[in-house]
Amino acid sequence: IEVRANELRILAEAETPPFPIEENSKTKEDLRLKYRYLDLRRPDLQRNIMTRSRVATMVRQFLADEGFLEIETPTLIKSTPEGARDYLVPSRVHPGEFYALPQSPQLLKQLLMCSGMDRYFQLARCYRDEDLRADRQPEFTQIDMELSFVDVEDVLEVNERLLKKLFKEICNFDIQTPILRMTWREAMDRFGSDKPDMRFGMELKNVSDVVKDCEFVVFKSALENGGSVRGINANGQAGMPRKKIDALVEYAKGFGAKGLAYLAIHEDGS
C-alpha cells in the first residue's frame, strides 16, 4: 500500500542511543549503569528479571505448602554484633541516636520462634557495610527461614527439595539428592577453598609423609612449624617452559604465597 502524505509532523525526536539495545552487549558496564533504563531493555536482562520473579514465586509457594509463614521483620532495628559494619540511619525524633539496617534478621526470627511461630520465612533484604568483592555487595536479598523442634537433617532435607524443584522448573535440570556434602576441613584439604568448584580436577594432595625426611629448607621449615606440604598434579606439564613457570610463581605471589616449589617427573620416572 502506498500512502501519499501531505504533511509530516515529528512529535518526539528520537536521539541515537548511547549503545545498541541488544543481547550480549559489549558495552562497558559503567556506561550501561549510567543508562540503566536502556540497559534493562536488553533481552538477556529482561530474562534475568523474569527468572528472578519466577524463582521468588516458586519459593513462596513451596514454603507455604511446607507449613511456613511468610513474616516481614522490621528494617529499622537496634545495632547488634554481626560479621560486618552496620549501615546507620539517624533518628529525627531522638537526635544523636541511630537505627541500624539489618545485616540479617537473626534476632528477629529467634523472637518469632519463641513466640510460637514454628516455621517462618521471608525474602529478606540485608545490608552490610563491608569492602566490595566479586561476591559481596552492600545490599542483597536472601531466602531467610527458621524452624523449631528440628535437627540438622530436617533443615537440609527441606532445602534440598526446594533446590531440586527450582532447578527442575527453572532450568529443566534434575539434581541428585541428597546433595553431596563435605566438611569444611575436607573442602580446604582437597580444594583449598570453602566453596569449591567440584568440576576442578587438580585437587590438593598432602605429600607431607613423602617429604618428611627431605632437607629442602622450605618443606622442612613448614613441617617443623606444624604445617603441611601440599601440591597438585599438573598432568602432562613436565615440559613446561621456565618462562611459564616463572609467570605462575608471580601469579601465586599475588595471592600471598612466598613462591612455588615444583618437580618435573617424566613418564619414564626421570
Predicted stretch roles:
Residues 1-270:
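Class II aminoacyl-tRNA synthetase catalytic cores and aaRS-like
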